[in-house]
Amino acid sequence: MAKTVSWHIINAKILDVFNLTFETSELWIDHDKIVYRGRRSDLQAQHTFDAQGQYIVPGLIDAHMHIESSLLAPSEFSKLVVPHGITRVIADPHEIASVAGVSGIQYMLEEARQSQLHIHYMLPSSVPATPFEHAGATLHADALKPFYSVPEVNGLAEVMDFPAVFNEDEDMHQKISDSQAAGKHVDGHASGLSREQLAIYRKYGIDTDHESENAQQARDRLNAGFSVFVREGTVERDESAILPAISVANQAHFSFATDDKTANDIQHEGAIDFNVKLAIQSGMSPAMAFTIASYNAATAHRLDNVGALTDGYVADLVIIDSLDDFNIKKVMISGQWYVEPETTVLPLANQSLNFTLTVDDLKLPINDKKPAHVIEIMPHHITTTHLVEDVPSQEGLFVADKTYTKIVVAERYHNLGHGVGIIKGFQMTDGAIASTIAHDSHNIIIAGTNDEDMLLAANKLREIGGGEVVVNNGQITTLPLAIGGLMSEQSYTTVIQENNTLQAAFSKISHLNFDPFLTLSFMALPVIPSLKITDQGLFDFNTFSFINIQD
């Protein structure tokens, strides 16, 4: 008597990730697992799906990302990405944890359970990221340890405090050992590290990295034994420069990641499906590109029976019409065809903004006989260039112009102070922008051409409880982010519309052709080269110390 299973998919060209080939075959699926790939006379199915010669690939996996960067709660994020073929993400809730601590992690876990998307979490390793900024929380090893028993938790997220690892900081090493003792693994964050420094990370079992910006850096990480996550996000556009490092011989050690990508960019160009398209357009075989986007990511994160279309694997799959400019026709997650669910975003107790700024606080004294240290934006990268240049001043104070913009970071949790600096590359002709998204501690960050609009923007953030603001001659445009000042309680369609309005308002005061808010958010991250600013002042990555505006 034939055994009955849930689904029989016929007439499909199915990706074999083990041989990097497509073969015409069939899939038998029972509940959430693939029972068999191929013909079987002893099986029958409750439902049959005729793929009509279309292609089937495993569900795409984002190997490293932050849901908060989409400005969406997890349940709304899933509604946006699943139609792009994404069936699984490995997320680091570092952003909300920096604001709300343990309760932030608990919120992300609970909110994600409304989603059909598989959301795995890596526990934030560095809250705060460094001692050079004030955060809303401090998470020691003992606070993280209970989470390792949660099924959705997959390990320790990007270890970004290299000095703590190198100097054998007790708490950092306890976090690493706790993850490994629980049978989990540890992600790296090796921005700016030399080959010798990479070896230190590997010594302690840190086994992945997503910070390569070019092929040589990717080869260095590969040679050191890392799994390399090839990043293509909103700001960090690294994939094209890394692709030359990938070959048939080494492809198994590469995966795709977005890291930080806005909802607008996901809607317009895609998520990991965009990584795949870039790879194919660059000459990579579709079979290899889809394997990197699925099975390799699952392997890097030690996800058993995930990422392949054969016996015993979870039935996560995507049906596409062609291999060149592929269009996604259907998505199956755990044996169920995806239909967008009706869900409501869960609230998070309000995180009030506690800061005080005056116009006098924003003034920046400058000696016009000396050059100043200036942060220069690198388009489509989160690294910056450290410049020393003459800057405009008047009556002993810095004055912004079309080249140089003032930047301020104000501590938002305990009103502990602020840092003021100069940034080049925002191309602002008027007004100001401000945000409660400032990696990784998410203090208030403001950039502007005049102190009055900058102060108005900051005060508007307090009024709306966090978010993003554009001010143009007193006219204010806002995108409220009620969840910790990082995520919206609204639907993904509403957030995309509000962000479009915000970007349109910014376009009236700047000629910048890339996302200003995501770019601005990384100007406060001191663990990324080269010159950044925190609530404590101007920070030089190369010396790992604070410096004055002028020597």
UniProtKB/Swiss-Prot annotation:
Family assignment from sequence similarity: Belongs to the metallo-dependent hydrolases superfamily. Adenine deaminase family.
Cofactor: Mn(2+)
Signal sequence region: none
Catalytic activity: adenine + H2O + H(+) = hypoxanthine + NH4(+)
Protein name: Adenine deaminase
Top-level taxon in the UniProt lineage: Bacteria
Hydrolase keyword on record: yes
UniProt gene name: ade
Record-linked InterPro entries: Adenine_deam, Adenine_deam_C, Amidohydro-rel, Metal-dep_hydrolase_composite, Metal_Hydrolase
Keywords per UniProt: Hydrolase, Manganese
An annotated Gene Ontology molecular function: adenine deaminase activity
Enzyme Commission code: 3.5.4.2
One GO-annotated biological process of the protein: adenine catabolic process
Group of enzyme by EC: hydrolase
SUPFAM superfamilies reported for this sequence: Composite domain of metallo-dependent hydrolases (SSF51338), Metallo-dependent hydrolases (SSF51556)
Organism lineage: Bacteria, Bacillati, Bacillota, Bacilli, Lactobacillales
